[in-house]
């Protein structure tokens, strides 16, 4: 064996490595900076932690001042209970909190913050000053940290009851982190979004935001339905509530309320989705999956639903201590929560009918306005009156221009010769042209606007594609193929639900390789697969045999579908893969069976289609998410012709 000798420089390097490998206690500042890597990602992360502390303190008004998107300055001031002078040093210490005392408190925590590390992390990467005063204190106190050990320095200050936290020069001592920040507008958009989420979570708190000296957001306390709706409109835009369904349901200790946008108000990005669990804004895969399922049949490809939903559940049934940012939660019974959310939203969207989308009540009959020659217009259809002096104008008689009409005053215009049609004959021709079609009489139409169906009565068909109808609000345009496709699709789904998913045994069972966890999951949910039309048998630790598949499925699709269902069952405790696949097949059948373009329909057939739409779930969209009808009110039509301007 040959001995390897190290020269002097190599030995020194080896000794250095050995010395570096020794375990040492990190300084408090370095430890906090490491923790800040998880908690403080950008200015929006800072504002989230500070707002949570303000809300937990019982604040009813929060003022936020920001400069350069929070990178230069971020100041939060509240009127909460404040912090006593004795507790101020602990407020900036790691793992120090007033919100929990033991594990039982953690398992039922209702406060937004509880980890006791936010202020310590922020103060390690920025210049932080905290000033506070309690209601029973004679004066306020201020605390700052300094040095490698982050020693707290407390001194008297002037401040009303409440707390102010001032954060300056974010990431001044960690320039590498600062390089990852985006443009000022991007960072402010993230910060603004956090504040909007907090404002939606707490209607009872006033929020005021200023950026670079300019007021950006000013929201007063909202204690009634009108004020809450006003706040939602201010944050989500006025169009949201106009195109949203209010929902509220409570069952088995689960309470869900809020607003879900109609499919016609979908977005190209998922930027108008707010979900709160016990007042905490969360982003959860289980919730996203339930919402996606509920909207599955009514959203166009690539579109995202809109919603503001508040979910309330026993605190012991949800774990909020999943991630330092507290964005994620874990439900104790995820499947029950998933099914509750999906079922509630699915029913709410299914109950939408044209009358809901038209805004409810029929508009009151307007005062008759003058028409015809007196108003400078033609008369209404069937009563078009032509002035005698026009029809009886002498042939070749010039229209004399007023004297002094400028350079063209000597020009005279002679109209083309007319045939001299008598007035009575012309009026008779117009009456015949506008006479009602055979089979439709005025007596068959409703006598009052309240008797008119939501989609009204058909007037005509355009290019064999669209139905034109009149309702109490104005003109209705219907894509007849898309509408009939939805009607057929819903009827096929009902028939399938009544008959169930019948299974077809395979002559030769097919084996599928899975993981041991997937095989265990298949055994645990064997009845679920049976309801879906499958018959599975475990052949080994990592092998399943497929003995029966749903009758409508092809054998080649069975393996992939079983794998997808298993993945869903392990992730969410439930799966809709088979149903979704069946719906695709039914949708194809409905598409091929629906009325095709260029097919001429009689008026009674068009009216029959309109009545079917009014009584069909989700009739506002076809199977692919495209709208099936639209409304043009009288005001919209007046704008096209510049009436009333």
UniProtKB/Swiss-Prot annotation:
Disulfide bonds: none annotated. NCBIfam families: mutl, PRK00095.1-2. HAMAP family: DNA_mis_repair (MF_00149). The keyword DNA damage applies. Keywords: DNA damage, DNA repair. One of its GO terms (biological process) is mismatch repair. InterPro entries: DNA_mismatch_repair_CS, DNA_mismatch_repair_MutL, DNA_mismatch_S5_2-like, HATPase_C_sf, MutL/Mlh/PMS, MutL/Mlh/Pms-like, MutL_C, MutL_C_dimsub. Residues 353-381, 395-420 are annotated as: Disordered. One of its GO terms (cellular component) is mismatch repair complex. Belongs to the DNA mismatch repair MutL/HexB family. This protein is involved in the repair of mismatches in DNA. It is required for dam-dependent methyl-directed DNA mismatch repair. May act as a 'molecular matchmaker', a protein that promotes the formation of a stable complex between two or more DNA-binding proteins in an ATP-dependent manner without itself being part of a final effector complex. The keyword Oxidoreductase does not apply. CDD domains: HATPase_MutL-MLH-PMS-like (cd16926), MutL_Trans_MutL (cd03482). GO terms for molecular function: ATP binding; ATP hydrolysis activity; ATP-dependent DNA damage sensor activity; mismatched DNA binding. This is DNA mismatch repair protein MutL. It holds the Pfam family MutL_C.
